[in-house]
Amino acid sequence: MDESTVDDVIERLLEVRNNRPGKQVQLTESEIRLLCLTSKEILSEQPNLLELEAPIKICGDIHGQYTDLLRLFEYGGFPPEANYLFLGDYVDRGKQSLETICLLLAFKIKYPENFFILRGNHECASINRIYGFYDECKRRYNIRLWKTFTDCFNCLPVAAIVDEKILCMHGGLSPELKTLEQIRRIPRPTDVPDTGLLCDLLWADPDKDVQGWGENDRGVSYTFGPDTVTEFLQRHDLDLVCRAHQVVEDGYEFFAKRQLVTLFSAPNYCGEFDNAGALMSVDDTLMCSFQILKPSEKKGKFMQGGNSLAGAGRGTPRR
């Protein structure tokens, strides 16, 4: 995919910034196919455990909330102004999964060494067949295009480590995870299995009431307690686990005495929750701070400027 084509796609996807929220961008099917094929090549060449450097901005679930994705970039800076890591769950539930994933893939192609996207549990055919992405592809294009996305998703990396100290993934830890080398060795392309290391990295959840490992109410993977986090960090000489996968009221939430943080970047999730969204900025000393997308006022009230930016959260030193 040549540079002028990528630039043109990005320009059209960003044109709607000043339009009413929800305005669709209908790229051609061949453009989307090219986005998938080109990004798939780049993703496959990069490791399954990305080794990244601060400063970087980290974002949690987006779930097709394209207007909020644009707002995140307005606050954090549009690439290449800042380096980004997204933790997965780009599609399903929201109304504009296609615009969301297309912009992220386009930025991946344009800035392959500055823009990074991990796999979430929704970047999996058996899940996004049910929760909205398949239907959106079928309605706006065709089923064949959905299958092309599946091939691309099967090549997404599953974890990242920032400056050898902050381990990032979509879901959480796994009882099978003994060395980080195991993550590097997960083969790609691959579907997400029902059990095992890859499944846990995308599906597991922390639970303050659990010691060790517990059952997960989702019916998939496990929950893990604060003791599990502490032991894991000590064993691997890490400072922090950064994950997404759960709606949290303030857009970010600490666990296990600030040894783990959950990030969620889709405010007013599904229009049903009153949650904020957050992005976490990691500076070059590994200090973490948060930029918050506040939930909009209840419908019917006009809120100046939509989701306003609350002050960055208290900085958390990491070294």
Swiss-Prot record:
UniProt xrefs under SMART domains: PP2Ac
GO molecular function: metal ion binding; protein serine/threonine phosphatase activity
Catalytic center residues: H122
Gene Ontology annotations for the cellular component aspect, listed alphabetically: cytoplasm; nucleus
EC number of this enzyme: 3.1.3.16
Keyword Iron-sulfur listed: no
Keyword annotations of the record: Hydrolase, Manganese, Metal-binding, Protein phosphatase
Enzyme category, top tier: hydrolase
Keyword Nuclease assigned: no
SUPFAM superfamilies xrefs: Metallo-dependent phosphatases
Cofactor list: Mn(2+)
Catalytic activity reported: O-phospho-L-seryl-[protein] + H2O = L-seryl-[protein] + phosphate; O-phospho-L-threonyl-[protein] + H2O = L-threonyl-[protein] + phosphate
Leader sequence residues: none
Record note on cofactor: Binds 2 manganese ions per subunit.
Disordered, as annotated region: 299-319
CDD domains noted in UniProt: MPP_PP1_PPKL
Residues reported in the UniProt entry to bind Mn(2+) 2: D89, N121, H170, H245
Residues annotated to bind Mn(2+) 1: D61, H63, D89
Family designation: Belongs to the PPP phosphatase family. PP-1 subfamily.
Protein's name according to its UniProt entry: Serine/threonine-protein phosphatase PP1 isozyme 1
Species this chain originates from: Acetabularia peniculus
Source species taxonomy: Eukaryota, Viridiplantae, Chlorophyta, Ulvophyceae, TCBD clade
